[in-house]
Amino acid sequence: MSFQEVWEKEPMKKPRIQKVTVNFGVGEAGDRLTIGAKVIEELTGQSPVRTLAKQTNPAFGIRKKLPIGLKVTLRGKKAEEFLKNAFTAFKACGKTLFASSFDQVGNFSFGVPEHIDFPGQKYDPSVGIYGMDICVTFEKSGYRVKSRKVKRSHIPEKHLVTKDEAIEYIQAKFDTEVVRE
């Protein structure tokens, strides 16, 4: 029996996207970070959070706690819409998604080297080109029991999202090919 048949028969077992995290590693503070914030806000529709350097690196001119990156967490419909555009951009730059990008609980990540590959984006010399990392986290119905305050419990292993389930979900929902090595 395929996963699709199981999901139709038992909807609680169907995985869903918990969140999509978009990371911009700008590498420096200042104008480039400000422009990057405008780019990421235009792509996602949400204002980003600045990420701080964890350690000092004099070779790159980075001090501890200096803002060097941006991130946005998307959930629900916004996450799915952004992921559709991200897969379009990912395919446009000639990349393929490999099964090795998925971990054992179905989460995966990929990178888009240029933000201008997204639909509706044009190159602007004053902005430049920004790349990003996109991380997708999966869950199933009932995952709230592990994070709630009252009567917290663990999720049994049989109810965790597997690598194969996540791959089939992505292939069916977003019409994206995942190459198995």
Swiss-Prot record:
InterPro entries for the chain: Ribosomal_uL5, Ribosomal_uL5_arc, Ribosomal_uL5_C, Ribosomal_uL5_CS, Ribosomal_uL5_dom_sf, Ribosomal_uL5_N
Annotated SUPFAM superfamilies: RL5-like
Any one biological process term the GO annotation gives: translation
Keyword Transport: no
PROSITE patterns linked: RIBOSOMAL_L5
Molecular function GO labels: rRNA binding; structural constituent of ribosome; tRNA binding
Pfam family, one: Ribosomal_L5
GO CC aspect terms: ribonucleoprotein complex; ribosome
Residues of the signal peptide: none
HAMAP family: Ribosomal_uL5_A (MF_01333_A)
Functional summary from the UniProt entry: This is one of the proteins that bind and probably mediate the attachment of the 5S RNA into the large ribosomal subunit, where it forms part of the central protuberance. In the 70S ribosome it contacts protein S13 of the 30S subunit (bridge B1b), connecting the 2 subunits; this bridge is implicated in subunit movement. May contact the P site tRNA; the 5S rRNA and some of its associated proteins might help stabilize positioning of ribosome-bound tRNAs.
Similarity-based family: Belongs to the universal ribosomal protein uL5 family.
Assembly and oligomerization: Part of the 50S ribosomal subunit; contacts the 5S rRNA and probably tRNA. Forms a bridge to the 30S subunit in the 70S ribosome.
PANTHER family (UniProt xref): 60S RIBOSOMAL PROTEIN L11-RELATED
The protein's name in its UniProt record: Large ribosomal subunit protein uL5
Phylogenetic classification of the source organism: Archaea, Methanobacteriati, Methanobacteriota, Methanomada group, Methanococci
